[in-house]
């Protein structure tokens, strides 16, 4: 522990002890003395209440094993991890072991049946007092309380936007398409279309979006029937109305790849219109040389979102509406640079120098 003593040659000698990190020499802990006991044994008995962290048993070795809602430390100390009641018990699956556990309620016995799920609190207790229930329902975290005004404002704006969208959908199917849907089913039809659009926007395909929208409304009707105590006949009637409404909407209404409501287009018609679009674009070619060419291409893509998926439309736009056209001499590459050209500098690896390429405005799609 001490590597040595250093003394001075002067009259007033100072002893300096140098301590190093060497391991202490082995020896008896008690040095042959009768030391105090370690206070082993039970600290909590059968039926006593415990809090998390309270020690139940101190022991040398595992005389008792940890059961439910307790843990064992490195010195074999058993302590509670949940508030409850101490139970000493035997487990028929381990006949030679004695267990200590914590029951979550006083009427609960251990061990529980072996194949039953564990009883857990999930950090919650049941409230019986109406005042406490109301207080808990209205309670907000600090973060929610500080941002309450912003949250309420955003919620109000979302609800207003949702209702506006539902009104627009109803006007579209009643005024433009003139579907035979009675006004009493306005909310049902609008809600279905809103859910249908949300499913498409979240990445579902057509059938999945339709199924999820209808399933949601079916479950809401069943909950409403349970809440308002409808009889079976009334619930069946409402579900039948939902089936009729959704079937009519599915064959009358669709959405573009920008999630705008449009009249229904069959898969065969979509393929036909796609082939026609590709044919017309091929006739125009990829080299757009004038403003009229640009206008013609944009006109072709005007309704493309109705029958193309977003990926298909992006692919065709990249193919036929290149932001920078390929270099063609005397078409979009000038002989010399001037005020009307855009100079592009490119390193030429063969000649080890920078080439200066003057491009005309016809080389850039946005400048046409």
From Swiss-Prot:
Q: Would you kindly state one Gene Ontology biological process term found in this protein's UniProt entry?
A: translation
Gene3D superfamilies with a match to the protein in the record: 2.40.50.100
Please list the residue ranges that the record marks as compositionally biased, kind Basic and acidic residues: 31-44
What does the entry list under GO cellular component? mitochondrial large ribosomal subunit
Name of this protein: Large ribosomal subunit protein bL27m
Q: MF terms per GO, please?
A: structural constituent of ribosome
Keywords, ordered alphabetically: Mitochondrion, Ribonucleoprotein, Ribosomal protein, Transit peptide
The gene behind this protein is MRPL2
Domain of life assignment = Eukaryota
| UniProt xrefs under NCBIfam families | L27
In this chain, the stretch annotated as Disordered covers 23-44
Q: Name the InterPro entries on file.
A: Ribosomal_bL27, Ribosomal_bL27_CS, Ribosomal_bL27m_C
Q: Does the keyword Mitochondrion apply?
A: yes
* UniProt similarity note: Belongs to the bacterial ribosomal protein bL27 family.
Where do the TM regions start and end?
A: none
Transit pept. (range):
1-20
Q: Which Pfam family, just one, is annotated for this protein?
A: Ribosomal_L27_C
The record describes the protein's role as: Component of the large subunit of mitochondrial ribosome.
Subcellular location per the Swiss-Prot or TrEMBL entry = Mitochondrion
